[in-house]
């Protein structure tokens, strides 16, 4: 699917314990949320037609390219949802219509001194990864197909497969379905440029109000290997969404399973 004209956004802090494990709680110390388990905010990782570094299309498929300098980079295993954006007459977002979902690697550099989340998210071609297929969303609320899906991830290093993120049901997201949608709409309209966050309404304006958004809705907590090991060149990354009624958390292929596979270069 061609996403070069789609604004791409991510959600920070939508799974319990992820920010603590990633060492990023300090970045959000001055961000006040309405309730304790609310995500911290949203951030851009691709802005179509932008002249900034975020204007480079960074989403890859089978290759994850690390920067040419020494970095500490981690897989961030996520679900990405493709939404249609509905605006009112004054270009405020009034609805998000969920169409399809897939797996996503929101690979992140643990970068000291970064002022914005986006500075850790995009550094060149193949900074990100997206799954090998899309699953149509029948309804973005409880009772739909996404109720049955789990998200898991692995890194294969030197022939040994290690769980990287915990195996988590999508219903384990802190904010999901209507609660997430309403929160996203609010943040797209009202989030200010403050601390590590950015003014998303301004980005929508600068991108000429795109009709769709790819939103990566948050990374799972890390398994032990993922928490304590950064990526190395030659690693093989798997981010898998599977229907727990039919599939297992493995590399076998099925019509209901989405597998993102990347080799780290």
Task: Please provide the spans of the model-predicted regions.
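Glycine-enriched loop-and-adjacent helix/strand subsegments that border the catalytic/binding cleft
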Residues: 3-205, 228-229, 252-265
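Short, charged beta-turn/beta-strand-edge "cap" motif at the junction between a beta-strand
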Residues: 16, 219-224, 242-247
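Short, structured beta-strand/loop micro-motifs enriched in basic residues and often containing a Trp
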Residues: 197, 211-223
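Loop/turn positions that initiate beta-strands
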Residues: 210-212, 233-236
């Amino acid at each position: 699917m061609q996403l070069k004209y789609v604004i791409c956004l991510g959600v920070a802090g939508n799974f319990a314990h992820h920010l603590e494990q990633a060492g990023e709680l300090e970045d959000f110390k001055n961000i006040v949320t309405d309730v304790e388990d609310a995500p911290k905010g949203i951030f851009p990782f691709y802005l179509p037609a932008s002249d900034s570094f975020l204007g480079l299309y960074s989403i890859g498929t089978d290759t994850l390219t690390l920067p040419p300098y020494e970095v500490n980079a981690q897989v961030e295993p996520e679900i990405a949802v493709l939404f249609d954006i509905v605006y009112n007459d004054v270009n405020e977002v009034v609805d998000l219509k969920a169409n399809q979902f897939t797996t996503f690697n929101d690979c992140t550099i643990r970068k000291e001194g970064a002022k914005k989340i986006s500075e850790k998210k995009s550094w060149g071609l193949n900074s990100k990864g997206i799954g090998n297929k899309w699953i149509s969303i029948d309804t973005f609320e409880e009772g739909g197909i996404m109720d049955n899906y789990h998200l898991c991830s692995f890194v294969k290093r030197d022939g040994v497969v290690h769980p990287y993120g915990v195996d988590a049901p999508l219903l384990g997201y802190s904010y999901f379905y209507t609660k997430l949608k309403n929160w996203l709409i609010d943040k797209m309209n009202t989030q200010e440029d403050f601390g590590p966050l950015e003014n998303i309404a301004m980005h929508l304006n600068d991108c000429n109000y795109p009709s769709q958004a790819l939103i990566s809705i948050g990374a799972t907590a890390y398994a032990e290997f993922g928490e304590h090991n950064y990526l190395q060149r030659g690693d093989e990354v798997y981010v898998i969404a599977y229907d727990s009624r039919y599939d297992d958390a493995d590399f076998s292929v099925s019509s209901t399973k989405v597998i993102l596979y990347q080799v780290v270069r």
